[in-house]
Amino acid sequence: MNNCSAFFLVGPTASGKSTIAHILAEKKGCSLISADSMNVYRYMDIGTAKPLVHERGKINYYGIDVVDPTESFHVAAWLDAIKPAWLEGSIPIVCGGTGLYLKCLTQGLDSFDNENLNKRDLLNRKSLNNLQNYIK
């Protein structure tokens, strides 16, 4: 996702981001990328602020209804699902509040600092008993 421009509309839950983003995308004729980790799941429409089906016909949405709730999903798959948004020729609007998605989109997947990765690797090699003693 290097050198891909986007407009971002981010903020807390239930702050009206989705409605504003849809209106802007419709007026500007651009696509909309959902950066909400729950919107990727099909059939989970209640409480997720997904656009209604008739709204989805007006503009192109990415990152919505990507997998079934029984399937595993990770941020790399989300990045793959939204890539086509940049092929449309306009700058997409990224809307949502899932920090991991936003961080990986703006800083890349390899942006996690090595210190934490080294700590994780060290802890993964410890036994359950050692880990329990570690957190006491």
Ranges and model annotations:
Residues 1-136:
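Phosphate/pyrophosphate-binding catalytic cores of soluble transferases and nucleic-acid-acting enzymes
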